[in-house]
């Protein structure tokens, strides 16, 4: 991808250089034609055009590299962009979900967590059990 952009930049540079050399040559038109019909670039305009092309190319390349770096390293990137319903993709998605579960902070909820379990006093907690055993 970058090679195509680089080749396009080199072609544009070559065309600008050719235009600069042809502007110094004798005009191919006759003197009867008006000067407004000629479309030639001065050296200043050619330099400005070349500068604009180079700046645009560098900006596009840097944005593309940032986008690739962000997408390539992200675990949250959607799996649908990479593949769909393949066993390796399903395993990859499951491993990502497992990784997310392992890295998220734990919350103190559930049956095995420490903390206040009941608000009943100890003497009243097992009172009903004693009555049921005495009846047997």
From Swiss-Prot:
Q: Which GO terms describe its cellular component?
A: extracellular space
Region Disordered, as annotated, extends over 101-136
Q: Which residues carry this modification: Proline amide?
A: 114
A Pfam family annotated for this chain is Calc_CGRP_IAPP
From the UniProt record, which GO molecular function terms apply? calcitonin receptor binding; hormone activity
Q: Which UniProt keywords apply?
A: Amidation, Cleavage on pair of basic residues, Disulfide bond, Hormone, Pharmaceutical, Secreted, Signal
List the cysteine pairs that form cystine: 83-89
Please state where this protein is localized: Secreted
Q: Name one GO biological process term.
A: activation of adenylate cyclase activity
Q: Where is the signal peptide?
A: 1-25
Q: Which residues form the propeptide?
A: 26-80, 119-136
Q: Which SMART domains match?
A: CALCITONIN
InterPro entries cross-referenced by the UniProt entry: Calcitonin, Calcitonin-like, Calcitonin/adrenomedullin, Calcitonin_CS, Calcitonin_peptide-like
What family name appears in the similarity comment? Answer: Belongs to the calcitonin family.
Query: What function does the entry list?
Result: Causes a rapid but short-lived drop in the level of calcium and phosphate in blood by promoting the incorporation of those ions in the bones.
Q: What is this protein called?
A: Calcitonin-1
Species source reads Oncorhynchus keta
Source lineage: Eukaryota, Metazoa, Chordata, Craniata, Vertebrata
